[in-house]
Amino acid sequence: DNSYKVSGGLHGVGVSVVNALSKKLHLTIQRAGQIHEQEYCHGDPQYPLKVVGETDKTGTTVRFWPSELTFSQTIFSVDILARRLRELSFLNAGVRIVLRDERVNLENVYDYEGGLSEFVKYINEGKTHLNEIFHFTTDADNGIGVEVALQWNDSYQENVRCFTNNIPQKDGGTHLAGFRAALTRGLNSYMENENLLKKEKVAVSGDDAREGLTAIISVKVPDPKFSSQTKEKLVSSEVKPAVEQAMNKEFSAYLLENPQAAKSIAGKIIDAARARDAARRAREMTRRKSALDIAGLPGKLADCQEKDPALSELYLVEGDSAGGSAKQGRNRKMQAILPLKGKILNVERARFDKMISSQEVGTLITALGCGIGREEYNPDKLRYHKII
């Protein structure tokens, strides 16, 4: 019974649906010293469950052949299978999973003794990390198992993945809420105790704390509740306090026992808070600039006469000399020219404050007119529907 206490299935329809959509399904069950078999064709049993031998092993083998009557394409993607099986191996430390593709004689073996620690290491490969991986596993009093692994790196993105009974929740849920609350509280408490916030004169937010964070949250819940059949968000209320309590205890101890790592993490968070504040100020400056202000900027906009964005075109050209030629050859009624000087910033690799303080990027933002940032961006305000 213990094997199924935290099963991923909720409605008992998994193999039933596979069976209904298969032209053939074959079951082999090894249990209580005997081997049982049964076969189905388009969902109908071909014979009753029968004993075909003896064994000292346990386990179930399910083989199925998708029905061409249902699916127009029955080719399996080895990449999709590999991604999910690798994920399952990370989530279940010590479980060995073998993926064979007999079409091309390929075999992949997934066996990660380190579990979630190795999951974080795999995601952060090629990045510079700020701390050694923090990893803990604990069982709460209410039977909920909590496992967390995390590490900060030098990127600016948050990458947190949530799982309940090995099932991923892309929309998070109560386990994510508990994790975030404990993480922010633990870091704020550490920085206050070290007097870092007063000394650096910054106010940090939860977003600052999670910049560059890679984390895996895995909970084992006896009776999970999800927001929908697809299980993309966990809504079990008892999970939040379980995760929050476990994370509070373990993470606070980690920060105290690893002062160098704690200092590096705090430094990154303070930098993120400063960048956020600088970005806010720069965004306000950009917002105050109207399209008329662009004439005074290094990249001079030669606007078109047309006021309907659907009929207006914007040409981005390199340098003033190209801009001059383009202005002479354009159709003034509908074609606007914006010369941009020098090498434009690679915004994908730049922090938001650096991006928005770039003169050329600022010129572009103002010329396009649709704003920037989560609160400001509105594509309906775009001044040109054709940008070349």
Curated annotation (Swiss-Prot):
Entry superkingdom: Bacteria
Coarse class of the protein's main subcellular location: cytoplasm
Compartments (UniProt record): Cytoplasm
Signal sequence, renumbered to the chain: none
InterPro entries, A to Z: HATPase_C_sf, Ribosomal_Su5_D2-typ_SF, Ribsml_uS5_D2-typ_fold_subgr, Topo_IIA, Topo_IIA-like_dom_sf, Topo_IIA_B, Topo_IIA_B_C, Topo_IIA_bsu_dom2
Domain Toprim residue range list: 312-388
GO cellular component, one term: cytoplasm
UniProt function note: A type II topoisomerase that negatively supercoils closed circular double-stranded (ds) DNA in an ATP-dependent manner to modulate DNA topology and maintain chromosomes in an underwound state. Negative supercoiling favors strand separation, and DNA replication, transcription, recombination and repair, all of which involve strand separation. Also able to catalyze the interconversion of other topological isomers of dsDNA rings, including catenanes and knotted rings. Type II topoisomerases break and join 2 DNA strands simultaneously in an ATP-dependent manner.
Family: Belongs to the type II topoisomerase GyrB family.
PANTHER family: DNA GYRASE SUBUNIT B, MITOCHONDRIAL, DNA GYRASE/TOPOISOMERASE SUBUNIT B
Note: Few gyrases are as efficient as E.coli at forming negative supercoils. Not all organisms have 2 type II topoisomerases; in organisms with a single type II topoisomerase this enzyme also has to decatenate newly replicated chromosomes.
Self-association state and partner proteins as the record states: Heterotetramer, composed of two GyrA and two GyrB chains. In the heterotetramer, GyrA contains the active site tyrosine that forms a transient covalent intermediate with DNA, while GyrB binds cofactors and catalyzes ATP hydrolysis.
Protein name listed in UniProt: DNA gyrase subunit B
Species of the source: Acinetobacter junii
Gene name, Swiss-Prot/TrEMBL: gyrB
